[in-house]
A protein has these predicted regions:
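Short beta-strand to alpha-helix junction loop
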Residues: 72-75, 107-116, 154-173, 292-297
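Active-site substrate-recognition segment that forms the wall
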Residues: 29-33, 43, 55-56, 61, ...
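N-terminal Rossmann-like FAD-binding beta1-loop-alpha1 element of flavoenzymes
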Residues: 13-39
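Dinucleotide-binding Rossmann-like beta1-alpha1 core, especially the glycine-rich loop
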Residues: 56-138, 305
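C-terminal catalytic lobe of FAD-dependent flavoproteins
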Residues: 309-394
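Short hydrophobic core segments
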Residues: 16-18, 208-220, 361
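Helical element adjacent to the flavin cofactor pocket in flavoenzyme catalytic cores
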Residues: 154-204, 208-212
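Extreme N-terminal leader/targeting segments of oxidoreductases
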Residues: 1-14, 33
């Protein structure tokens, strides 16, 4: 059954997407591609966490205990990336989003790290994933800039990368090309009519009516006024500081693939771009809405990266940024309908927003056109938190 009632409201559209980061943009683009009249509201579309993110597509390397349910979603989305990149290029006159099938190397610097990596390797094998254990010498043969003290590592040839800034720009262009109407203003309040989401009022007073509303505002998704308390998106901001350096021609190639490690319990990664940029990240800080780049954050990232790749201290530091990841209570995304008819969520992607972009767009477009959430997304419905919510509001 087609779930949208086309043009039913004043200024009516089929779909209103609130939020213009990569998740909101991909949702709007895919909805428009399926023939839905789509409107998007965001004061700075293409901005948000994607401007800070490193762009690792690493479902295998980022596998964590207790998060195995996310694995299938991540693998399915990573598998879609080559075709997704090609479709975006077709839609935007050849835009390159920096998709690079370069692989990932996760390394250990001491005995504890080595044990941790061995356990990760065992978990990967139990999940049927492809990864190869390497000695320290084999790691350095692959990446000669690694520190002499590297004790071993995991080579994952299927974990790749994309440039999130290029991705965001391409998605914005694709939306414009597909006829999405973009209001460069924030949504201030959800409109609810007859116990159904019916659109939103923008900061400038504009009223947008729509048959279906998708809340895809990242870490801000829980702050929209007018949303009934029982369906407020349970997301929190998690700060991440990230550095960007430049690899001069004399030092190239500095790294040929993404390199990751756990250093003193903190995760650090180095993502080399083909244009000579090297992205180093990321801190993970539960500090509310603070996006200050701190001396301590920069120091910790450079210190850990230096232990991994000592030559990094010779590179020019070109940018420091901090962004906010949208974390849900179980750190898995919120995809699909809420208990308020007409209101859907596409948020809470936490560390996996870039990775899950292709699949999120596909899943949300299917929901918006058929009223059915695809099976792969059903474990991530916002309704998984409804029972606990109802108890707390009782």
């Amino acid at each position: 059954m087609h779930s949208s009632r086309k043009g039913s409201g004043r200024n009516g559209s089929d779909v209103l997407v609130i939020g213009g980061g990569i998740i909101g943009l991909v949702t709007a683009w895919q909805a428009a591609r399926r023939g839905l009249r789509t409107v998007l509201a965001d004061p700075a579309p293409g901005g948000g966490a994607a401007q800070v993110a490193a762009g690792m597509l690493a479902p295998v390397t980022e596998l964590h205990y207790g998060e195995e349910s996310l694995l299938g979603l991540g693998l399915a989305s990573a598998e879609r990336y080559p075709q997704f990149a090609a479709e975006l290029a077709d839609a935007t006159g050849g835009t390159d989003i920096g998709y690079r099938a370069c692989g990932t190397l996760a390394v250990a610097l001491d005995a504890d790290d080595r044990l941790h990596l061995r356990e990760l390797h065992a978990l990967q094998r139990r999940c049927g994933l492809e990864s190869e254990w390497l000695t320290g010498r084999e790691c350095r043969r692959l990446e000669p800039m690694l520190a002499p003290g590297v004790r071993g590592g995991l080579r994952v040839d299927g974990d790749h990368q994309v440039d999130p800034r290029r991705l965001a720009a391409a998605l914005l262009a694709a939306c414009e090309g597909a006829g999405v109407t973009i209001h460069r203003t924030a949504a201030e309040r959800l409109l609810v009519t007859a116990d159904r989401a019916a659109g939103a009022v923008l900061d400038d007073g504009t009223e947008l009516r729509a048959d279906q509303v998708v809340l895809a505002a990242g870490s801000l998704s829980g702050r929209l006024a007018g949303v009934p308390p029982e369906v407020v998106a349970p997301v929190r901001p998690v700060k991440g500081q990230v550095l960007r350096l430049t690899v001069p021609a004399a030092y190239a190639p500095f790294l040929s693939r993404t390199v990751r490690a756990v250093v003193r319990g903190s995760h650090v990664y180095l993502v080399p771009r083909e244009n000579g940029e090297l992205v180093v990240g990321a801190t993970s800080e539960e500090l509310g809405w603070d996006t200050t780049v701190t001396a301590g954050g920069v120091y910790e990232l450079l210190r850990d990266a230096h232990e991994l790749v000592p030559g990094i201290t010779e590179l020019p530091l070109t940018e420091t940024r901090a962004g906010l990841r949208p974390g849900s209570p179980d750190n898995a995304p919120l995809l699909g309908p809420t208990d308020l008819p007409g209101l859907h969520l596409a948020t809470g992607h936490y560390r996996n927003g870039v990775l899950l972009t292709p699949l999120t767009g596909e899943v949300m477009a299917e929901l918006l056109t058929t009223g059915e959430l695809p099976d792969i997304a059903r474990p991530f419905t916002p309704r998984r938190f409804s029972a606990a919510r109802q108890e707390s509001f009782a």
